[in-house]
Amino acid sequence: MAQVPAGKNRSGQLSKQTGDAWENQARRWLEGQGLRFIAANARERGGEIDLIMRDGAVTVFVEVRYRRSARYGDAAASVTPQKQQRLLKAARLWLCRQNGSFETVDCRFDVVAFTGNDIQWLKNAFGE
């Protein structure tokens, strides 16, 4: 019988691995759409940004969501107002570290949602 290392949460590890795989797929898909990769899993106080991309001169903060099926709603619907606020805060802090702000940098918030085999790209899904 396999043992889970002390202090490790196996289901949490699997969730992280699954999330990383979908984020990588979203990155490749967005690059195929012409966006340029900047960063992944940018952690700031209060939140994490899955992907930061560039679409021309626009900085794009991307939230990636996955649901196996739409039984309880599609993946895009899981980006709650609370999650949006955390992403806005994280993006504001990330921009500040880059010597920018929402006032000086053209940016938007996109959601790439995988529900089963379907992909949905919601450009400018929310904002401040």
UniProtKB/Swiss-Prot annotation:
Pfam families tied to this protein: UPF0102 (PF02021)
The region called Disordered is annotated at 1-20
**InterPro entries annotated for this entry?**
Restrct_endonuc-II-like, tRNA_endonuc-like_dom_sf, UPF0102_YraN-like
Q: Which Gene3D superfamilies match?
A: 3.40.1350.10
**A GO molecular-function descriptor:** nucleic acid binding
* Species: Klebsiella pneumoniae (strain 342)
**Family indicated by similarity:** Belongs to the UPF0102 family.
Stated name of the protein: UPF0102 protein KPK_0567
